[in-house]
Design a protein with these regions (language model features):
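Periplasmic plug
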Residues: 4, 35-80
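Surface-exposed extracellular loop regions of Gram-negative outer-membrane beta-barrel proteins
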Residues: 96-108, 177-180, 208-212, 274, ...
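Transmembrane beta-strands of outer-membrane beta-barrel pores
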Residues: 110-116, 130, 141-145, 200-204, ...
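Outer-membrane beta-barrel signature, preferentially recognizing the C-terminal barrel domain
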Residues: 353-356, 397-402, 428-482, 500-512, ...
Length: 671
């Protein structure tokens, strides 16, 4: 099911056990190199969340949520994207689907997922396809619920001694999603195609949280009774209080997309995409803290409105069957305004406006000769970000300009039994407005979060070597990160709180990664095993104390598919992650056992699938960070264990097409 193509890992879905998975998320879990994060989302090992393309167009979350897995041919995991991709993109998942059939089609899918609480989802897709016209519509409703347990503890070293602050959080989360999508695609001729797409999202959600907080002031005798950060009230100095909060949010968004695809000649083609999106959200968070007969109430509220305009053009010119160039550009404008309010001391009210414009251009050349193929590209991006604080009490305006060039290249050698690829890419990660604004955010009476307007962009340089031999695939990667942005905890002398968290740029970090994958087909059994290890070199001079964060992380997984008679299929997977050192944080090991079973009837029109994740409840993410002033630890337990039943019914088993690209997705994700 897996092979190398140039510098990409290709996963074959059609006519494999993956084609019987009920949803795209179930497929992505089995792609080598993908891993689950603390909140249950998926990311590429060492590269973060991938940007997903559907038939060369940037996909939206709504499109992916109702994508019919059986129509997927293959999925490419590109760890060194070319120059046409945004400079903030770490990895790309490129999903290729089959061509559409003509006729009326439909699909209904429901699932129920049981953990400590239930999540359910219902969706309906209908469409009509002719030789030249495709019209499809989608509606989905999700009632998403999950519980969170998040204990935290901080040992704070201040001038007058050591303080201990702790919180034991229990949260209940609920969100109701109503998502709609309409697509119209018109093939004007063999050379020209146009289309329009509209997406709408209505989200209402909330989080209720109960906390037991505790604190201990410095021991008057100067003795360190809690040097290992373990709770103990033997000395009678530990004090406790309770806190409750309710956070409710509302989001409304609309997104329109227009496209034109043209083939001007045998050697010249173009693609044009235009987008408009509007996003409006608001939330409120009342917090009540009780200690004995004393009670403190805090109310936090915020709202924002954003408009996004964007356009993109891509041109491909063939010089011959073996040589071509791609070039193009994009432009986007994001305008928004918002307001944050808090009744807590030091915070008050902040009104602001954001104005963000981006212009980019790229050029890439592809060629091949015999067993060799290569590509080289250059991308230029200019970004202007303007933040205006409208509050008269504390004006904090700023304007940032970014001008950067991003080179990339790749070279591949194909031999009868071997496949070699060497590639290089540069990327950037620019600080967000929330990190730059200078605002102060309330966490608890002992902790605030402060933004940092002096943050600089993070620049990353990656050199990757990939190889395939028969059933084995391997990868070596060197990564250098300049000015990485991380949290830091400090003890300010000029503010009446005991510690604050903020963002800061750090010096050079280096990572060395090695990866190996093996897969084979034994009749009805398809096993696949992979392992990877990453060693990090990183140290910080923290107020005169040189702290080393060097260390290794490694993980391994073993997937098994069993194809049985009468269209039954079983799967069993195991994964282990040692946690290790990631940035300044050290994680404890986690492991996961999962299984699945599905059965189809009526030539695939009816499918029932069952899956179980984290069978032994071992997906607990324990973290520890040591700094000069603060030792911080927490456990993130998102209750990832679950049992899920999915039922899918299809009418005529056809799928409508929409070939437009969403040029505004990057800006939407930032929101």
């Amino acid at each position: 099911m897996y092979k190398m193509r140039n510098d990409a890992l290709v996963t074959r879905v059609r006519n494999t056990p993956l084609a019987k998975e009920p949803t795209l998320d179930d497929v992505l879990k089995h792609i080598p190199g993908m891993k689950q994060t603390a909140d249950g989302s998926l990311e590429v090992n060492g590269l973060g969340a991938p940007t997903i393309y559907l038939n060369d167009k940037k996909a939206t979350s709504a499109e992916l949520s109702h994508l019919d897995v059986k129509l997927i041919d293959e999925i490419e995991l590109i760890t060194t994207p070319g120059a046409k991709y945004d400079a903030t993109t770490g990895a790309v998942l490129r999903i290729l689907t089959r061509r559409t059939d003509e006729g009326i089609f439909g699909k209904m899918q429901v699932y129920d997922q049981l953990s400590e609480v239930n999540t359910n989802h219902e969706e309906l897709t209908l469409g009509w396809v002719t030789k030249n016209i495709s019209l499809t519509g989608f509606y989905g409703y999700t009632d998403n619920r999950y519980n969170v347990h998040q204990p935290q503890e901080a040992l704070v070293r201040a001038k007058d001694g050591e303080y201990l602050f702790g919180t034991d959080r229990h949260g209940k989360n609920k969100a109701n999603y109503n998502a709609t999508e309409l697509n119209f695609d018109w093939l004007l001729s063999k050379q020209h195609e146009v289309g329009i797409q509209w997406e709408g999202l209505w989200l209402n959600g909330g989080r209720s949280e109960k906390q037991q907080q505790y604190y201990r002031y410095p021991n008057p005798t100067g003795e360190d009774t809690n040097s290992e950060m373990k709770l103990s009230d033997a000395d009678g100095e530990m004090k406790y209080f309770d806190a409750e909060s309710q956070q409710w949010g509302h989001q409304r968004s609309h997104h329109f997309n227009l496209f034109h695809l043209a083939k001007w000649s045998k050697h010249l083609s173009s693609q044009i995409y235009l987008d408009y999106a509007r996003n409006k959200d608001s939330d409120s968070q009342p917090i009540t803290e009780k200690e004995g007969s004393e009670m403190q109430e805090t109310l936090n509220r915020s709202n924002s409105n954003y408009d996004i305009y964007s356009g993109r053009i891509e041109v491909k010119q063939l010089f011959s069957d073996k040589h071509s160039i791609n070039y193009g550009g994009e432009w986007s404008l994001m305008e928004g305004k918002g307001k944050t309010e808090s009744s807590a001391d030091m915070l008050g009210t902040t009104e602001y406006k954001n104005h963000d414009t981006k212009t980019a251009a790229y050029l890439q050349y592809q060629g091949e000769a015999g067993r060799w193929s290569w590509w080289a590209g250059i991308r230029y991006e200019h970004l202007t970000s303007r933040y205006t604080n409208l509050s008269e009490e504390s004006p904090d305006n700023m304007e940032r300009h970014y001008d950067q060039w991003f080179p990339s290249f790749g070279i591949t050698l194909k031999e009868p039994s071997w496949h070699h690829s060497l590639s290089f890419r540069t990327t950037t990660a620019r600080p967000s407005f929330s990190q730059l604004s200078g605002n102060i955010y309330y966490t608890s009476r002992f902790q605030y979060q402060i933004s940092n307007p002096k943050l600089q962009p993070v620049n990353t340089y990656r050199l990757t070597y990939s190889v395939q031999w028969k059933d084995f695939m391997g990868m070596l990667r060197y990564t250098r990160i300049d000015h990485s942005i991380m949290y830091i905890h400090e003890v300010p002398e000029d503010k009446p709180v005991r510690y604050v968290s903020t963002f800061m740029n750090f010096n050079k970090m280096q990572k060395y990664m090695a990866y190996l994958n093996w897969g084979h087909v034994f009749d009805c059994w398809r096993p696949n095993a992979h392992a990877s290890i990453t060693y990090q070199r990183f140290s910080v001079n923290d107020h005169g104390e040189l702290i080393s964060y060097n260390g290794a992380t490694w993980n391994a997984s073993f997937d098994n598919y069993f194809t049985l008679p009468n269209d039954y299929q079983l799967s069993l997977s195991y994964s282990f992650d040692n946690g290790g050192q990631v940035g300044k944080t050290k994680f404890s090991p986690t492991q996961n056992w999962s299984l699945g079973a599905n059965k189809s009837w009526m030539d695939g029109r009816l499918q029932v699938a069952f899956s179980a994740n984290d069978l032994f409840h071992q997906q607990l993410f324990k973290e520890r960070t040591h700094e000069h002033a603060v030792d911080f630890s927490q456990t993130e337990d998102y209750k990832l264990w679950s049992y899920k039943l999915t039922i899918t019914w299809k009418f005529n088993k056809r799928k409508g097409r929409y070939n437009g690209m969403n040029s505004a997705e990057d800006e939407l994700n930032r929101l």
